């Protein structure tokens, strides 16, 4: 246990706070001793697309994206998982007032599934009755039914049909159903998955998309190396397809203000220091900062007598996910465990314990799987998993 006390936000506090073992603080959220605040709404939100009052800063990014998609160009946005790509895009897109559809390619299983999913999403914003004349141009007519439970339109194609023909017909319909003055916005999330859905799918999509005039494409991706290869490799079909934009962490000062103002309702004069503690632990990661702040706020409301609300919240989150963390730890090999432990402790990876090529390959795999991210250095994506590793060491 580290005994040295540091002022929150000081030059060394992020290192010390980031690696000290979890303090044995136990919470019982069932015991609500603060009746006065029990009906207050938690001002922090995580896990879903964040909008309106829960949205954090990103004013410049939103303004840039909104202005950019008012042109006839396409946008490519690269950012690590849980950095808020979808929230930023959705805020900018909604400000344009134009119709849009959004599809996560991680949920797409095949080319025919991609075609059906795009058509399904389009039916949500454009009634099928207004598209019947365009559907007659389909070389393979889809089966469209209404879900009796949700009332939504379900789209499917007969098995065994030419999937590339299906996709071409659907993308052509999306373009023909709109005009240059009122372009449809098509958002494809986790776009790097295009390479795993089917061979040469990227070539087919690029050949269709580059001829369209009535659609703005926004292509999002979380795998830095794969997205860069798709859009910056001269041999790639999508080379220079659109404006390339990278979304980093939130500026600390802006994020601190956001957290402090919302924590003040529970912690009054202590909110500045608590905001610093949160950002020191999370490294200003948007998702995990919101998650920790939400749990700290809960501690302040339900157990206001808790001496260190931040570490109480960290302890609670880590214990809540301990079984998942253990399962993950047991599923990876010893090289990966060593790398995660070294990164958790803030130590170098070039120690001679493993060959440099072995470490490099392992880090790249961990990065692809989402366990490790790189900004100015390699680090664990999940600070709570980092804390679990340190506690188990």
Put a short name on every predicted segment.
Residues 284, 290-357:
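Winged-helix-like regulatory helical subdomains adjacent to P-loop NTPase cores
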Residues 157-223, 232:
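Conserved Walker B catalytic segment
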Residues 2, 9-75, 80:
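A short, basic N-terminal segment
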Residues 386-393:
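Short, amphipathic alpha-helical interaction segments positioned at domain boundaries
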Residues 229-280, 301-304:
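Helix-loop-helix "sensor" segment of P-loop NTPases
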């Amino acid at each position: 246990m580290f005994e040295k006390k540091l002022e929150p936000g000081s030059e060394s506090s992020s290192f010390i706070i980031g690696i000290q073992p979890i303090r044995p603080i136990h919470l019982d959220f069932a015991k609500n001793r603060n009746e006065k605040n029990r009906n207050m709404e938690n001002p922090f939100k995580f896990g879903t697309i964040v909008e309106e009052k829960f949205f954090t800063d990103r004013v410049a990014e939103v303004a840039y994206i909104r202005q950019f998609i008012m042109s006839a160009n396409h946008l490519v946005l690269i950012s690590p998982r849980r950095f808020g790509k979808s929230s930023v895009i959705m805020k900018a897109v909604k400000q344009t007032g134009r119709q849009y559809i959004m599809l996560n390619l991680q949920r797409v299983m095949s080319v025919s599934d991609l075609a059906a999913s795009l058509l399904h999403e389009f039916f949500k914003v454009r009634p099928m009755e207004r598209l019947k004349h365009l559907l007659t141009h389909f070389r393979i007519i889809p089966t469209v039914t209404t879900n009796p439970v949700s009332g939504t339109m379900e789209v499917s194609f007969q098995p065994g049909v030419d999937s590339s023909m299906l996709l071409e017909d659907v993308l052509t319909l999306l373009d023909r159903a709109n005009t240059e003055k009122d372009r449809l916005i098509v958002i494809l999330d986790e776009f790097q998955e295009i390479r795993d859905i089917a061979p040469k799918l990227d070539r087919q999509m690029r050949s269709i998309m580059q001829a369209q005039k009535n659609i703005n494409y926004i292509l999002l991706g979380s795998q830095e190396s794969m997205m860069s290869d798709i859009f910056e490799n001269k041999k790639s079909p999508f080379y220079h397809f659109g404006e390339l934009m990278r979304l980093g962490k939130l500026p600390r000062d802006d994020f601190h203000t956001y957290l402090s103002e919302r924590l003040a309702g529970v912690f009054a004069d202590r909110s500045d220091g608590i905001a610093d503690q949160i950002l020191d632990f999370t490294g200003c990661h948007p998702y995990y900062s919101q998650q920790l702040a939400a749990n700290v706020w809960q501690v302040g409301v339900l157990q206001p007598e808790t001496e260190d609300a931040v570490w109480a919240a960290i302890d609670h989150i880590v214990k809540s996910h301990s079984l998942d963390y253990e399962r993950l730890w047991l599923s990876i090999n010893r090289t990966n465990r060593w790398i995660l432990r070294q990164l958790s402790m803030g130590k170098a990876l070039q120690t001679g314990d493993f060959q440099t090529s072995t470490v490099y390959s392992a880090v790249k795999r961990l990065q692809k799987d989402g366990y490790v991210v790189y900004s100015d250095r390699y680090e664990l994506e999940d600070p709570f998993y980092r804390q679990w590793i340190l506690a188990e060491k």
